[in-house]
Amino acid sequence: MRKIIVSAMLCGMITAGFAQVKLPEWVGNVKLSGYGMTQYQANFQKDAKTNTFNIRMLRVALDGKTGDFYWKAQIQFNGNTSTLGSSPRVVDAFAEWQHFDFLRVKAGQFKRPFTFENPMNPIDQGFMSYGQAVLKLAGFSDRDGDHSSNGRDIGVQLQGDFLKNAAGRNLLHYQVGLFNGQGINMSDVDNQKDLIGGIWVMPVKGMRLGVFGWTGSFARKGNYDAADPTNTATRTVRLQQRRYALSAEYKADGWTLRSEFIHSTGSAFKKTYQKDTDSKDLTINTGIGNKGDGYYALAIAPVIQNKLFAKARYDVYMADSHWNRAKSMYEAGLNYNFTKNIQLNAEYALVNDRNLAKHNYSMVDAQLDFRF
């Protein structure tokens, strides 16, 4: 009994000692969060049928505020360690000065300010994947041959909101930044920065009408070109890129209506950068020319408020801006929220891919997503 009493007194003294230690304010503002996306997908393409379970995404983040600064670090864990496209990697690492609403300054690695859909959390985006044009022209599995960068790059950005109406709601948002142009976790190759920016108006609550622009380059330093195999000198090849996007969205009362058109002018490397040797391959992809574009239109409608949603999307991408190379997807499905942190998504897609001998095939996708 005496031992128990002594132990209890010691525990009390230790606890009291810790209680007197005042931790820095910023420690109390640090938050651990993350999300996971599990997936089943079946593809019924002729002579290429597949069905598989998959971990689409698993991310863990730390973020917090100290004074006027907000910071975030996020890591993606799923994938293998053999390719850049699916290896575990840092996706976000930035700090932003947020003293003024009309002027916030961000530096580090973060989302490129291009299109409405790119900066969205993939669970909130609502479908089995981002729109094809967003994937190909905003830095995911990019048309230019860059490694998978989840729409991100390293740089510095200014953004802000202003022109408040009588209700105190801002009517105008802008964002503009300078970036390396090489995607995540990569230094610049050609010392030419990408200038990317957007501006949108919000005439009524829930509505955004925006325009985005992007000018810059994607470059490689290497010594192999299939079009000139005898030239083994190490050299830098720069591919100029010019892109723009027109975007519209209305989101209110559980409804989401969104559409975007994206166009790109600029050549592409033939081999996608997946491993170190790919970065030295300077061969140009002449098969898709120097233009590409696409667009999508989607609707998400509440069936049971905050619980069950019906959705549909029309999604088109043309790798060379010609209709005879178009890949069109007609999608419909349902999203169900078990709780605010657990969501089940299911959809059917009819695909018309004019790049294939057999244009038409179907897909089924189901995802169970969770947040913490």
Can you describe what each PLM-predicted range is?
Residues 46-47, 94, 109, 118, ...:
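Outer-membrane beta-barrel pore domains
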Residues 38, 112, 185, 214, ...:
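Short, electropositive, low-hydrophobicity segments enriched in small/polar residues
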Residues 180-184, 230-233:
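Surface-exposed cleft-lining segments at the edges of enzyme active sites
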Residues 4-13:
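Sec-dependent N-terminal signal peptides
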Residues 4-5, 61, 262, 315:
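Residue-level detector of intrinsically disordered/flexible regions characterized by low predicted structural confidence
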Residues 21-181, 189-196, 200-209, 296-302, ...:
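Outer membrane beta-barrel
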Residues 15-19:
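Sec/Tat signal peptide C-region and signal peptidase I cleavage site
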